[in-house]
Structure formats: structure tokens, C-alpha cells
Amino acid sequence: GGRYPTLSFSHWDQLLCMLFAQLTTRQSLRDITTCLRSYSSKLYFAGFRGSVARSTLADANERRYSRIFEALALHTMHIARGLYASEPLGVELSQGVYAMDSTTVDLCLGLFGWTPSAKGRAGLKLHTLLDLRGNIPSVLSITTARVHDASFIDRLHLEAGSFYVMDRGYFHAARLLRFTTAAAFFVIRTREKMLHQVLAEQPCDAMAGIVSDRHVLLTGKHTGSGYPLPVRLIEFHDTERERTLRFLTNNFELDAALVARLYRCRWQIELFFKWIKQHLRIKAFIGNSPNAVSIQIWTAITAYVLVAIVRKRLGAPASMHAILQILSLNLFEKTPLPTLLGNAADCEESDVPVTHQLALL
């Protein structure tokens, strides 16, 4: 579908326009086309096959099927995950480790009336399964804000032996049973008043913050029937924030302290959402239709993953944000990327603490 010729403005031209908008944080259709026009002598060598009119780009985003851009984003995600497959995790595990969460993009109900409103507000949810080896999205889904987080589990092809780390918004007993059936492991934070019956008490390391480590059966009206198997309940005291957290897992072999550290790794997905919202265009949209919004989000994800691929393949020591800044200023230059990035080793983030960037990637 994407290769079919569409007059003088191809899907490839459309993709380049949208990536240009993401990498240079353009604000509107007019902003995009005006800036591209200023590079008219360089467009052909950058891959464009013709000039770009505002109405042409608007019409393409309105009418062309967004699934083409989704497929491209998923393909780049697959490539990037392969590159980062041996990336260290920070925990002593050889299996895959994934964090699952969603972020809400607020929209104006008057402009985006096609999104069902909740409490008088419109919005979208970006459901994400993040591969923590490299912090590359593995699965992404765009829904309206009303869709419950736990329903995202139904879309997943679970990998046997891998760990899936979730917050308590994903607690749904019957869906958690899917992980056990697939020989995959979950680590999920639970509610304090979850009904359960204690089957066995395990020794715990108080020095590591472990308050209790128990084998239990869920006994709630829906949880007991939804997950009828024994499960492990771990209480962990976080001394940094002075709070006690309760984790549920179907893995009975890992050290309890390691389970707590696994849950702590879930913070990486929060940093991922923060990064794309700060540095890419997914909070303000250049089109109001569902198709235009989807295209913009998928090209934002593609831009993020392409930067991650460049960073890994070139072995660039610079942060993701530093690379993004360098690319935004040199998109139409002929200087090779390794040369551009070679002097960026000492670049530091100006708006996000360096410790956060190092934790992100």
C-alpha cells in the first residue's frame, strides 16, 4: 500500500515531512512547510521527490491509512530491540524483562469530539510494553482514554520465561492467569486490602527491606475464581520514601529482594513517557482527525526509535536528547553522522537531570 504512487506526494514524502516535524519540533502545518521551503535546494538530496504544500500534507494526514505508519514504527522497534538485546538490566537476570504502563494525552473536546469524554474531558491513552533492555517499546496501542489499562494484556503475545512488571492498575486476576498459563512471570503491585489466605511463610531478609514473603491463595469473590492457583505475596519497605509496598508474583524462585528491584525497574517506563512528551510532538497535534492524530503519534515513536538505533549503531556516548538536538540542527547537512556525533561525548542535558537520562538509556 505504501509503495503505490500517489501523484507527486508519496507516502515516503509524507513520512519525511512528519519526521522532520518531530525532530525539529515544528508547531503547525504552516510551520512545517515554510521551514521545508527554506531548504528547497536540499530537499531532493534528503529524499524528498517534490515540494510540499500545506494543503497537500494536511490532506495526506487526513486521508491516508495510518496503519502504514504503525507498521513502520513496529518494524523499527523490532530492529532496535535486536540491537539492544544484550544491554545490561541492572538486575542479575538473563530473561527478558518488560515494564507495562500507559500515559494519557489530554485533548480539547471541542476539536477532538471523536474521543469519548470522561468527566467532561477528551483524551487518548498510549498503552506501552517497554523492553527494559534498551528501553525500546515492544508493543504499543493507541486507544481512547476510557479504555481500562488491564485490557492491554489481552493484546500481548507473552514470552515464556520473561518477566512483566506492572503497577496495580493492571491487577485483574483472570488476566494474570494468562501469564502463568504461558509460563511467563508477572510482578505487580497489589492493593493493601486484597483478600487472601496464607499458605506458607518464607524466611525474609529484613536488612534488604523485606517485611514478609508468603505463599497465598486469593480469596476474593472475583480474584479467587479468576486466579485459583497459589501466588507469592511480598511486602517491601522502601526506606527512601518511607512506605511499604506489596508485590504479587507467580515466581517462587527469585530472591524477594530481587523481586523488589525488578519492580523498581518499572520506573524506566515513566522516564520513557516523560522523554517523548518533552522532546517530541505528541501533546499538540497538527490535525484533528483520528487518522492524523495516529499518524503523528506513530511517527513520534518512529523518531524516538530511530534516534536509539543511531545511538547504538554508532556507539555514540551522547545522550538521546543530545543526539536529537544535533540531528535537528543538521538534518540537511552532508556531514556524516559519526562526525557530527563524535564531539558530543561531553554533552549534558540542560532541562533534564543527567542521572535521569543515564537511567533511561
Predicted regions located by residue number:
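Internal glycine-rich, Lys/Arg-flanked active-site/core loops of soluble domains
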Residues: A60-A85, L89-V91
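Short acidic (Asp/Glu) patches
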Residues: K42, R81-L83, G110-T115, V147
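A short structural micro-motif
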Residues: Y39, H78-I79, I282
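Short alpha-helical linear motifs
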Residues: S55-D59, A80-Y84, A344-S350
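Blade-loop segments of beta-propeller domains
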Residues: Y39-A46
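Single, function-defining residue in the core of a domain
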Residues: G1-D31, C35, R64, A71, ...
